[in-house]
Structure formats: C-alpha cells, structure tokens
C-alpha cells in the first residue's frame, strides 16, 4: 500500500486534486467533518497521512510515507534526505528579505554587519547571508515575523511573501529574494529504488499533468 504524506492547510486542496489525476482519490480528507489523520483512498490501495507542513519531509525521509507533497520552502529549511521529484507549480510564493520602508535599505547587502534578522526559516536565512558574505544575528520567531522590524527586535526579516499585502500594511518592503517556492512532489529514496512500477507511474502522471497545466 502506498502512503502519501499531505500537509494540512493551503497545499491540501490542490494536492488532493493532483493526486486524483494520478488515480489516488483522497477527497475524503477535504470533508470538514473528517477527524482522521490517516485516511484511506477511495479504492483502498493507498492511504494519506495528514500532518503539519514541516513534518511532511520528515515522514518521507524516515520511510513512513513513500510520497509527499510539500512546499520548496520547507524542503530548503529542513534539508531532509528525500528525492525532490516534480515541481507541481501551485501555491507559489517568494522567500524574501524585508525591512521597514523608511529604513532606506534597498538591498540585503546594504544591511549593517551583525544586524539582527528575524525569521521562521533560519536555515534558509543563514545560507543566504553566508552566500552574500554578510554576518548577521538570526532571531528565530514562529509567527508574526513582521513585528520584528516594527518592535526593534530585528533590522530585517526573512519570510514567505505571496501578494505582499501583509508587508505593505505593516510598513515593510521587500529588498531581496532568496528563491521562489512552489509545491513539490517528494519521495523516499529507498522506496523509489525498490519500486515495482506503481510509484513511477504516479510520478509520471503528476509530471505530465503539471506540464499540461503549464501550457
């Protein structure tokens, strides 16, 4: 039986749609009355694990799920040993550096050395600032990261940005982009090597459906 790790929240609906195109019907997870965290597919040949976004690559890396769908932001932050197979293209957003609009900074390299940068994505932030050779002090926050520059706890933030509305409403602007994040299909590497063909079939269908939607 194939097990697929699915993230609760923004990725879930599109993930279910894409998997249905590959013959895995997990529409039951979208039922608002559903309280199950392990949900069988309609055909009974697969099951879905409903987990937090950040836990998807963990379940896949440890082999408790053969496949998973997760944002590239989480993959980059977690750095788990999984196979990143298909860019599914939905739920796109930017991982950006932002500062107060009144700060005068217009590029990350203009930030002062050893300034504080707040983020939920400290691994991504650390790699970015190392790449531009700017030493910073990272402050790990788990929510409302925009408050960092407003309260003075940090000079800048690194966070996901979709429309930019929240930044604008809080007087912040983007000054650099780390990468563009979209949903990715990932797999457990050993499961891929031992695959009898079923996993590869799902992967190929999801790749082709992504290519078709892009045309």
From Swiss-Prot:
What this protein catalyses is: 1-(5-phospho-beta-D-ribosyl)-ATP + diphosphate = 5-phospho-alpha-D-ribose 1-diphosphate + ATP
- What EC number(s) has UniProt assigned to this enzyme? 2.4.2.17
Which terms under GO biological process does the entry name?
A: L-histidine biosynthetic process
Pfam family example for this protein? HisG
Which pathway, per its entry? Amino-acid biosynthesis; L-histidine biosynthesis; L-histidine from 5-phospho-alpha-D-ribose 1-diphosphate: step 1/9
Q: What's any one GO cellular component for it?
A: cytoplasm
Top-level taxon of the source organism? Bacteria
Q: Which GO terms describe its molecular function?
A: ATP binding; ATP phosphoribosyltransferase activity
Q: Which UniProt keywords apply?
A: Amino-acid biosynthesis, ATP-binding, Cytoplasm, Glycosyltransferase, Histidine biosynthesis, Nucleotide-binding, Transferase
Gene3D superfamilies, per the entry: Periplasmic binding protein-like II
Subcellular location per the Swiss-Prot or TrEMBL entry: Cytoplasm
What family, per the record?
Belongs to the ATP phosphoribosyltransferase family. Short subfamily.
Domain observations:
Lacks the C-terminal regulatory region which is replaced by HisZ.
Q: What HAMAP family does the database record attribute to this sequence?
A: HisG_Short
Job of this protein? Catalyzes the condensation of ATP and 5-phosphoribose 1-diphosphate to form N'-(5'-phosphoribosyl)-ATP (PR-ATP). Has a crucial role in the pathway because the rate of histidine biosynthesis seems to be controlled primarily by regulation of HisG enzymatic activity.
Subunit structure of this entry? Heteromultimer composed of HisG and HisZ subunits.
Query: Know the name of this protein?
Result: ATP phosphoribosyltransferase
The protein's organism comes out as Prochlorococcus marinus (strain SARG / CCMP1375 / SS120)
